């Protein structure tokens, strides 16, 4: 069976309300997993997702939960080739809130194989770097303030208000933000005056130390003023 989707809104509505009900337990090399038994439909769906969400420089994959909100539902991941399938834990996601009838477009990062304290520091680090790129988020995107142990920049769109043209603009905006982050901080290395190589992570660590030292100095000056 083959199913053709004329628009992103039609595709997303199917993923939100139809796809989950057609999944069955299928044996794979990784054990029993939820899949469409209709392989032709599965492949057609994946190809149409790639076509509908084509962004220069990014690859696209259909995933099946959990997404950042830990729901067992289909979602879509966009990522740079160097960050294959979110291997570095950074990607753009499109997920679906069936109960709210909403599409969510977001930037996030994975939290696997890291201690909570490490993730908290990473979240602060990422937020600072994104603020350097875009001090004020545009097009209705916002930071999810409820995610204390991750960084999520997101926008919620109700399917009844969905516009393919507006979503295309939103997608370009958020993926450009993601690509700029990957370009600046993902793989870049700086040359210092001493000809030693230093990564952005090392620069950021030093910046955080300086910020802490400045804060301590400011507190000390304030205390002196009270005497």
What spans do the regions from the language model cover?
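Charge-dense, low-complexity intrinsically disordered segments
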Residues: 32-39, 161, 197, 201-204, ...
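Well-ordered, non-membrane alpha-helical segments in soluble/globular domains
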Residues: 37-47, 119-130, 170-171
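Aromatic- and glycine-enriched beta-alpha-beta binding-site module
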Residues: 69-118
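Charge-rich, low-complexity N-terminal segments
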Residues: 3-74
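Flexible "arm" and connector segments at domain edges
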Residues: 189-227
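Long, solvent-exposed, polar/charged low-complexity segments
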Residues: 2-26, 30, 38, 144-191
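Compact, glycine/acidic-enriched structural inserts
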Residues: 33, 97-149
């Amino acid at each position: 069976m083959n199913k053709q989707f004329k628009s992103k809104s039609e595709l997303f509505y199917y993923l939100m309300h139809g796809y989950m009900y057609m999944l069955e337990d299928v044996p794979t090399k990784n054990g029993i997993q939820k899949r469409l038994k209709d392989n032709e439909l599965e492949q057609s769906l994946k190809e149409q997702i790639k076509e509908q969400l084509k962004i220069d420089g990014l690859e696209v994959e259909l995933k099946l939960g959990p997404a950042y909100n830990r729901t067992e539902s289909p979602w879509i991941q966009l990522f740079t080739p160097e960050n294959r399938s979110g291997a570095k834990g950074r990607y753009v996601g499109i997920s679906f809130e069936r109960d709210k009838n909403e599409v969510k477009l977001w930037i996030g990062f994975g939290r696997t194989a890291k201690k909570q304290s490490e993730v908290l520091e990473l979240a602060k680090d990422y937020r600072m770097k994104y603020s350097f790129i875009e001090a004020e988020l545009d097009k209705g995107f916002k930071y999810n303030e409820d995610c204390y142990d991750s960084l999520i920049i997101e926008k919620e769109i109700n399917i009844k208000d969905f516009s393919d043209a507006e979503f295309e603009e939103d997608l370009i905006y958020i993926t450009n933000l993601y690509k700029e982050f990957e370009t600046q901080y993902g793989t870049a290395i700086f040359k210092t005056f001493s000809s030693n190589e230093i990564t952005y992570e090392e620069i950021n660590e030093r910046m955080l130390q300086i910020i802490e030292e400045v804060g301590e100095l400011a507190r000390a000056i304030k205390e002196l003023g009270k005497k």
